[in-house]
Regions:
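Active-site-adjacent structural elements that line small-molecule/cofactor binding pockets in enzymes
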Residues: 1-189
């Protein structure tokens, strides 16, 4: 059995000192992995709280930036996103981030993905929420393609993108009705 834990990348504990202490402690422990969350921000006067989100989550450090940080301050432990909301980011840029993280960490990154749910975040980013599943699947397809080729096509424009992505394990989060079929198609766990 593998055991991981979430490290808060939000609220008052989202400081370099706390993150490095937690990551190094986990690296020296018997834990297998550490995980961070993803939100861009929260609406002011956040009053609809379907998932127990704290208002402190408005102060959240970016999970991909933290992954680079973890790569630099640890040597053994795997680390991942629980979950990275793929529709919030351009697909090609996400692939580049993942390739960079995998290179810096010598392949220790774990990619947990999801489609997101906060209407306000989608509107603020100019991403149609109704297209989140489609965007998510297109991004996952590009991630899979990046494992097999240095030439990727985005918006009908082929580009050589290096370093080639070392395949991270892909974990699919979300509501069972949509997440389970997606997990069976493209997920690793």
């Amino acid at each position: 059995m593998l055991v991981g834990t979430n490290i808060r990348n939000w609220g008052p504990t989202a400081t370099p000192e706390c993150l490095v202490a937690c990551a190094r402690y986990a690296d020296q422990s018997t834990l297998d992995s550490i995980w961070v969350n993803d939100h861009i921000g929260l609406p002011p006067n956040f009053d609809h709280n379907p998932y127990g989100i704290s208002p402190d989550m408005a102060h959240m450090l970016d999970p991909l930036g933290i992954a680079c940080f973890f790569a630099a301050v640890t040597s053994r432990i795997k680390f991942g996103t629980g979950v990275l909301i793929l529709p919030y980011r351009p697909a090609l840029l996400t692939v580049k981030w993942l390739a960079t993280i995998q290179t810096l960490s010598h392949g220790r990154f774990l990619l947990g993905t999801g489609v997101g749910y906060l209407d306000e975040e989608f509107r603020a980013l100019g991403v149609p929420k109704r297209e989140r599943g489609k965007i998510n699947d297109e991004t996952l397809a590009l991630i899979k393609a990046a494992v097999d080729s240095d030439i990727l096509t985005s918006n009908n424009e082929p580009l050589v993108v290096k370093p080639r992505l070392q395949p991270p394990p892909i974990y699919i989060g979300g509501a069972p009705a949509t997440a389970l079929p997606r997990a069976s198609r493209v997920g690793d766990g």
